[in-house]
A protein has these predicted regions:
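PLP-dependent aminotransferase class I/II
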Residues: 4-13, 17, 33, 68-178
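Active-site phosphate-binding strand-loop segment of PLP-dependent enzymes
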Residues: 1-58, 64-66
């Protein structure tokens, strides 16, 4: 969440032992990396979102599935075309991205590294400014290159959280921890 990546080696091994596909949800981690390994390169396939609140936004959302597995790629293509292959043996959807949306995303991708550097610099300023306050700021982990999709702070004290939320017209992104 929020651009963080975690070590998934135990989960990957669990999936591999049981012949379960490891699908990497990288919707909020585009541009992030952990120990030089980029988000979206870990799973059997990975998914990214281009919704309006993501690092790269399309004009009407959308997303992409990445894989280097030919069978997974074939199956994803079938599902996005109403389940059509030679016959309709799979439930599918009309999940094709409009060309205009794809072109806008393509152009925005060209600025991703620069925008990420700016978000990281702002996050460092926030970390310094909030250092002496009774809040929990995003953790800085060795080896993590965080895209800072969101800069999330937590309050230990609920009354302080309520006062700050009201004063700043802030919101709680996820009400209950996952």
């Amino acid at each position: 969440l929020f651009g963080y990546m975690e070590d998934t080696s135990v989960l990957q091994a669990f999936c591999k032992e049981r012949n379960i596909l490891f699908i990497e949800d990288a919707a909020q981690a585009l541009g992030s990396s952990l120990n030089g390994v980029h988000a979206g390169t870990i799973g059997d396939c990975s998914v990214f979102s281009f919704n309006s609140n993501k690092v790269i936004a399309g004009i009407n959302g959308g997303g992409v599935v990445l894989t280097d597995d030919d069978e997974i790629a074939k199956r994803v293509k079938q599902i996005r075309r109403h389940g059509k292959d030679k016959t309709f043996d799979t439930l599918g959807y009309n999940s094709r991205m409009y060309v205009l949306n794809a072109r806008i995303i393509e152009q925005r991708m060209k600025h991703m590294e620069d925008n990420q550097s700016k978000r990281q610099a702002i996050a460092q300023q926030y970390n310094q400014a909030f250092a002496d306050l009774p809040i929990v700021t995003p953790k800085v982990t060795n080896g993590l290159n965080n895209n800072y999709h969101k800069y999330v702070i937590r309050f230990e004290d609920k009354d302080t959280r309520k006062r700050v939320k009201k004063a700043l017209n802030a919101s709680i992104h996820y009400e209950t921890p996952l």
